[in-house]
Design a protein with these regions (language model features):
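Short, positively charged
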Residues: 2-59, 64-269
Length: 269
């Protein structure tokens, strides 16, 4: 295993542990508690609540502790399969998602998710009908996905996100795959630190206020051609982890982006 990959994994584990510790500090300070994991919206398997702390007043907080106010952090990760099932995405649009995220079933195995050029070219040519001669060795062949310029029907992805921007934002920030009948798992507030690990720096936003405002924002493909701007959110292929996790959808945003959208620094608790 390369030193770079080892460092990425250590960083990911360290960030997760740090985040969990801060969430517990938040709960202790405000007398909150974390809800239990409940069955998902299909009643098939338990899923992680979007709520990190239910405070005594009943508000349900999603707690974020970024390095700086401008740091974009992960706010939702999921497989293309579950996302498309949740939103009823099928047919040629689903195929476009699979091209962009590299989520075709033959690209999700431990030996095929990355650095398997022959298998990736086979999927491109025999499944998708994509000519592989001019694909980028670094950004496409190595990573077993297509960038936006080579995704057939990519404009339909952008259009779909534009037409569903409020529902997608609500999914990312408040619901995930939780059953909305289990209200304790559904976040209604976001609590962001403006100084890392500083409980006194926390600013709070109402998520429905965010959802109301994103309807005025545009969806487009960013200059890198590997990221969709979905209103407030940046959406990319995860690009880390092993197997199918490497090709997950990862949504990111920052405190400053929300502050700018609402023209509001957020309230204190």
């Amino acid at each position: 295993m390369s030193t770079k990959l080892q460092n990425q994994r250590r960083g990911g584990r360290s960030g997760l542990i740090s985040g969990m510790k801060f969430e517990e500090m938040f709960r202790v300070k405000h007398g909150g508690h974390k809800p239990d994991r409940r069955l998902d919206l299909w009643n098939e398997k338990k899923t992680e609540p979007k709520t990190d702390s239910i405070n005594p007043g009943g508000d349900r907080y999603s707690v974020k502790n970024p390095k700086t106010p401008s740091t974009e952090i992960q706010v939702q990760v999921c497989s293309v399969e579950r996302f498309c099932r949740r939103f009823g995405i099928v047919g040629s649009l689903r195929e476009s998602f699979d091209m962009f995220f590299g989520s075709h079933k033959d690209l999700l195995g431990m030996s095929t998710y990355k650095n398997n050029p022959e298998n990736f070219k086979r999927v491109c040519e025999s499944v998708w009908g994509i000519d592989t001669k001019n694909l980028s060795p670094k950004w496409e062949i190595r990573r077993c996905r297509l960038t936006a310029d080579n995704v057939r029907g990519v404009e339909n992805i952008t259009e779909w996100f534009q037409n569903n921007i409020e529902e997608v934002t609500r999914f990312v920030l408040t619901e995930s795959f939780n059953n909305t009948d289990n209200i304790e798992t559904i976040a209604n507030k976001m609590a962001w630190t403006t100084t890392k690990n500083d409980l006194d720096s926390v600013r709070v936003f109402d998520i429905e206020e965010i959802v109301k405002e994103v309807g005025s924002l545009k969806c487009y493909i960013k200059d890198s051609r590997t990221v969709f701007k979905v209103g407030l959110l940046d959406l990319q292929m995860k690009g880390s982890g092993k197997g199918s996790h490497y090709h997950n959808m990862q949504f990111n945003c920052s405190y400053n982006q929300i502050k700018q959208l609402l023209n509001d620094e957020g309230s204190r608790i």
